[in-house]
Amino acid sequence: METTQTSTIASKDSRSAWRKTDTMWMLGLYGTAIGAGVLFLPINAGVGGMIPLIIMAILAFPMTFFAHRGLTRFVLSGKNPGEDLNEVVEEHFGFGAGKLITLLYFFASYPILLVYSVAITNTVESFMSHQLGMTPPPRAILSLILIVGMMTIVRFGEQMIVKAMSILVFPFVGVLMLLALYLIPQWNGAALETLSLDTASATGNGLWMTLWLAIPVMVFSFNHSPIISSFAVAKREEYGDMAEQKCSKILAFAHIMMVLTVMFFVFSCVLSLTPADLAAAKEQNISILSYLANHFNAPVIAWMAPIIAIIAITKSFLGHYLGAREGFNGMVIKSLRGKGKSIEINKLNRITALFMLVTTWIVATLNPSILGMIETLGGPIIAMILFLMPMYAIQKVPAMRKYSGHISNVFVVVMGLIAISAIFYSLFS
């Protein structure tokens, strides 16, 4: 009896210990969330003045952590190990709801994949012509080479995708922090002049209006919902009944890392410029690094900007691919199930990879202007799945009821509603 208890305790201790795979997933979560959008965040978040920026910095961790933890718990609440988000939705809310969420989940993740395919083609094309002084190959060939390169990693499976992302995080964070430190001597007091509750922001809106419209910027800057389902499934297979505790710990470390590195970079950029500079950068619709390179006449920043963007886009593309693949696979499986048919998962993954390769290549070649609008329309869907659906499940699903009664649940719902309302206001104003 004592031997059995001792072995059980030892087994629990080994499962509670931090593993190499935990570090890999922590960096994978970071890699999915922090994409090329971080290069626009100092402008979008800082243009409203210091007060909204400070409030957003305070809200960043709880907003990111509680929302993503809720979605992770939702995926883990399925009866059987190996169930992804689509299957858990169907289990809890029925076939119709499962089909709808699968469709919405795909159309929330997939357009972001298309945006990244266009972005990496534009960035490499610009880098070759401006920094390297080369004539880039025709857009169709260049985009095909880049997308095939990223899809080659996908071909080796989920573990390789997460591993590649975790490796790419190191140079990205390193360069981001070096840039933030490099800007410290340029810090000035101009941004601090906006530290007043009653002054109108540089955008022409009042403080609360500026803060309201800035919430979605923060939500999507730290969003990594497309990889959450794969993360939860992998950790449940690895840790069993201890998966929830382990996932919460990994999420916490990933989000602390996100908030500290990104907000340090944002504050360093904002403090090195004036509010007028930030407004000019927003007007020009260029990344903060492009503006800093021109502003401080620093060619080294001009060189670093596209390199950082390429790394950021690549790792985010890989993370969002997992979400888009899950959504596409879910739609195919549900469609076949309705006809009494099934498909082998490896075969389906190959079909999905081919579909993603062809469509991202076509879109990257054509570079359609409507893509930004499609991505924006996906915003409310992401916010609904990430913020509202898990909180609704806590009230309605017996397996989730143990998480009820926490003030953090109310906080997540409020932030979700604020984000969704602000997105719709921005769309139609």
Where does each model-flagged region fall?
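Hydrophobic alpha-helical segments and their helix-loop junctions in multi-pass secondary transporters
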Residues: 154, 170-200, 218-222, 270, ...
